[in-house]
């Protein structure tokens, strides 16, 4: 059967607030108030069954509408819906890397705390080090790892790998995938001088994990100001 224009538009029209096209708009409006998607930066993508919903590139994220969404077929990687006046997200290859590992939602922010932590780690530990912190209550909001049951505990150490930034977002995919392979239990990857990618099994988990991690990153910056260590060793 051929796909009609009506079928294509039906992909982004729903009264359900949890429909991916609606949900992305709601999330990005919230993320804007947190300073995560300032100045058209950042993005969010949701996998719903065999379809990937992606916020466009170069738009004010707090003003997006469901009709601004791109929709891609997960298997073929072809666009089912592509707004003519908007650009596909430069984050798409990075989002797909998360979805190919079972994620249901991936969030990319330009959080200042994420950027600052990558600089602090580089200054104090070098470019090969990851961010590590322990004995912080909010760590309990982060899963133990892919395929593992439950979340990290208070005495567990949270580790988030850091990759170097590139001139073009899509060029991050190779290093991001390499970090995913090296750190299979991580649900987040920091990008130096840029931001962070966080993903989860579903929208709820990705959102709460991103909130927990940003809280921890802000805390880490404030701890550094006070000369407090992130870990005991």
UniProtKB/Swiss-Prot annotation:
It comes from the Eukaryota. Binds 1 zinc ion per subunit. GO terms for molecular function: methylthioribulose 1-phosphate dehydratase activity; zinc ion binding. One of its GO terms (biological process) is L-methionine salvage from methylthioadenosine. Pathway: Amino-acid biosynthesis; L-methionine biosynthesis via salvage pathway; L-methionine from S-methyl-5-thio-alpha-D-ribose 1-phosphate: step 2/6. Zn(2+) binds at residues 108, 110, 194. Its EC number is 4.2.1.109. GO terms for cellular component: cytoplasm. It catalyses: 5-(methylsulfanyl)-D-ribulose 1-phosphate = 5-methylsulfanyl-2,3-dioxopentyl phosphate + H2O. The keyword Ribonucleoprotein does not apply. Its cofactor is Zn(2+). Pfam families: Aldolase_II. InterPro entries: Aldolase_II/adducin_N, Aldolase_II/adducin_N_sf, MethylthioRu-1-P_deHdtase_MtnB, Salvage_MtnB_euk. It is found in: Cytoplasm. Belongs to the aldolase class II family. MtnB subfamily. Catalyzes the dehydration of methylthioribulose-1-phosphate (MTRu-1-P) into 2,3-diketo-5-methylthiopentyl-1-phosphate (DK-MTP-1-P). This is Methylthioribulose-1-phosphate dehydratase.
